[in-house]
Amino acid sequence: MISKVLESILLDRLGKYINTRDNQFGFKPKHGTELCIYSLKEIVEMYRGQHSSVLIGVIDASKAFDRVNHQKLFTKLNQRGVPASIIRILAYWYANQSMQVRWGSSVSGPFSVANGVRQGGLLSPALFNLYMNDLSDQLNDCRTGCMIGNTVINHLMYADDLAILSPSSAGFQQLLNVCTEYGVRHDVQYNSNKSSVIICRAKGDKDLHFPQFYLSGEKLCVCYKVKYLGHFITDKMSDDDDILRQCRTLYAQANMLARKFHMCSDHVKICLFRAYCTPLYTAPLWGKFKKSSMHRLQVAYNDCFRILLKIPRWSSASELFVNAGVNTLQALWRNLMYRFIGCG
């Protein structure tokens, strides 16, 4: 508890020193994963509308929070003009921290930690964003990427989740080289097996050949879809795969609730359904999908409510939702979209 109070005070004192680039969406007010994904999709769709292909690289940094070099972090704080007294507090805190591992009833002996920001710390997200901000600066300095108005956008970040964008293969490889060099200097290790490239082709570029791309000397796999921030992005910018992901999530949540809370009253089950089954992550971003995919989601949403309340499948879904005071899928989706654009 005392450590959280101290971190809260330090975070308030550091606020004006640790502002990061607009490309970083993580742990910022009025930002989030959905806004980051939306920005990525809008950029790609704009370029495809102008008959230009776009290369997207989703880069995975292995245990990035655990690999932060303390000395380099404190150097960055000093370069930002952070008071020396605050840096000394952080340096002493990190140098003298120790951890223990609990496994069942066994507890290991204490051991020191030489790298990484504190797990669960209030200050840790801000320190990590600052640690990675120089990578954002170096990528922006490349001046290659997607031109939006008078601004070049070649990457988007949410904490350690990085996506790079470029309409040219040479520019794309240049961005990968910048990431590689930054990783070497700042102890950031990339996982090439979990990093991938998507080529969102324009209609006229269907037969165009693209070269191989390399990150940290390893060849990157070219995929037709990738999961970025929990949302499926495909080379055709279709949302069908993500809707099917949501169908699977709904059934998993409903079965879990039905199994664990089968003895509860219907009122409790309805509250649980609202809490676990109605968020529909990234639903406001769905704009390009087949009717059959949305029909499957409709069936899944209705089925899950019936499963939880132990009601036969042939019962009327619309009447069921009205009587329970729960939004239908169409009403829920509309409300989520209004909330996302700031009208709800």
What is the predicted role of each segment?
Residues 105, 189-224:
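Short, conserved micro-motifs composed of acidic
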Residues 10-24, 127-159, 163-165:
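Active-site palm subdomain of RNA-directed nucleic acid polymerases
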Residues 1, 5, 9, 13, ...:
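Amphipathic alpha-helical segments in well-ordered regions
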Residues 49-51, 154-157, 224-225:
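Short, flexible turn/loop "capping" segments at secondary-structure junctions
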Residues 159-160, 191-196, 200-202, 225-344:
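Non-catalytic, peripheral interaction segments enriched in hydrophobic/basic residues
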Residues 64-80, 155-185, 201-204, 235-238:
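Catalytic palm subdomain of template-directed nucleic-acid polymerases
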Residues 6, 10, 14, 40, ...:
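Mobile genetic element proteins and their domesticated derivatives, centered on retroelements
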Residues 1-130:
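Conserved pre-catalytic core of RNA-dependent polymerases
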